[in-house]
């Protein structure tokens, strides 16, 4: 979702997925993206950049912030997940770590690479793990692991003053 309207906040809710906030200062646009692995895999970053460009924005004037989300040391995945990414592009193996017969996915690094591939070089990353920081963030995976029926959501918002 993007907007150039002043004094209207746009926001997204996440619970392990990556919240991404974007600003393009010259054309005065902001964007908010909810990027889980599926959305990232299907190109939500590229689609949002294209939408901003369609509205006169330039990649070189965009600044993105990838907010708190599940980090690679907490994001264990199955082999079929790894294979899905590897089959799409062999370079995707760079977003996985293998430890003690377990596979871990680096969602933040994957999203960052998509910004770079699409010309956005100014990227801030909040290096907070929603899964491991139990007192600070809600986490879908942590709630499921602890057998809770539901979980809270973290909100990320952006606005042009």
Predicted regions and their residues:
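Active-site microenvironment for binding and transforming phosphate-containing groups
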Residues: 1-161
């Amino acid at each position: 979702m993007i907007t150039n309207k002043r004094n209207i906040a746009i926001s997204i809710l996440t619970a392990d997925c990556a919240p991404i906030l974007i600003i393009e200062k010259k054309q005065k646009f902001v964007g908010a993206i909810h990027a889980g692995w599926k959305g990232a895999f299907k190109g939500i970053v590229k689609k949002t950049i294209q939408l901003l460009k369609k509205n006169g924005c330039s990649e070189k004037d965009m600044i993105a912030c990838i907010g708190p989300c599940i980090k690679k040391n907490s994001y264990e995945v199955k082999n079929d997940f790894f294979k899905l990414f590897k089959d799409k592009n062999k370079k995707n193996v760079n977003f996985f770590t293998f430890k003690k017969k377990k596979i871990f996915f680096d969602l933040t690094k994957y999203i960052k690479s998509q910004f770079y591939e699409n010309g956005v070089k100014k990227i801030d990353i909040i290096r907070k793990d929603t899964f491991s920081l139990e007192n600070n963030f809600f986490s879908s995976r942590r709630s499921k692991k602890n057998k809770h029926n539901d979980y809270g959501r973290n909100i990320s918002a952006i606005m042009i003053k």
